Swiss-Prot record:
This is Small ribosomal subunit protein bS6. It holds the Pfam family Ribosomal_S6. PANTHER family: MITOCHONDRIAL 28S RIBOSOMAL PROTEIN S6, SMALL RIBOSOMAL SUBUNIT PROTEIN BS6M. It comes from Coxiella burnetii (strain CbuK_Q154). Keywords: Ribonucleoprotein, Ribosomal protein, RNA-binding, rRNA-binding. GO terms for cellular component: cytosolic small ribosomal subunit. Belongs to the bacterial ribosomal protein bS6 family. Transmembrane segments: none annotated. The gene is rpsF. InterPro entries: Ribosomal_bS6, Ribosomal_bS6_sf, Ribosomal_S6_plastid/chlpt, Transl_elong_EF1B/ribsomal_bS6. Residues 107-119 have a biased composition (Basic and acidic residues). Binds together with bS18 to 16S ribosomal RNA.
């Protein structure tokens, strides 16, 4: 089996359907004997350029291990799903399981904001 990295851009109006879509795609992969090594939901982000007059999209990243048949099924599912405005499937040499740079940056941002709030609360208690 080969390793793949998949990025999916979902129409922002369909963000509520993302968990169901992810579940459907994961079940497609697992039914055929594949594995999902990493799944990240990057949320709604600004696009670099508009796609079909849409300026934002809901981003998903998946790293999977499967055979070519599953990839063909996923490509067809992406193509015929109106909520998916773009998809990219890349072949990788090995499985990638660590967090992406985008998720690491988001985690650092959350921790630094929490530290800032704690520091402000401590300062207000002293005053």
């Amino acid at each position: 089996m080969r390793h793949y990295e998949i990025v999916i851009l979902v129409h922002p109006d369909q963000s509520s359907q993302v968990p169901a879509m992810v579940e459907r795609y994961q079940s497609m992969i697992k039914e055929k004997g594949g594995k999902v090594h990493r799944l990240e939901d990057w949320g709604r982000r600004q696009l670099a350029y508009s796609i079909d007059k849409v300026h934002k999209a809901h981003y998903l990243l998946m790293n999977i291990e499967s055979d070519q048949g599953v990839i063909s099924e996923l490509e067809n599912a992406f193509r015929y799903n109106d909520a998916v405005i773009r998809s990219l499937i890349l072949k990788r040499d090995h499985a990638i399981t660590q967090s992406s740079l985008i998720m690491q940056g988001a985690e650092k941002g959350k921790s630094s904001r929490k530290e800032k709030v704690d520091a402000e609360a401590e300062a207000s208690e002293e005053a």
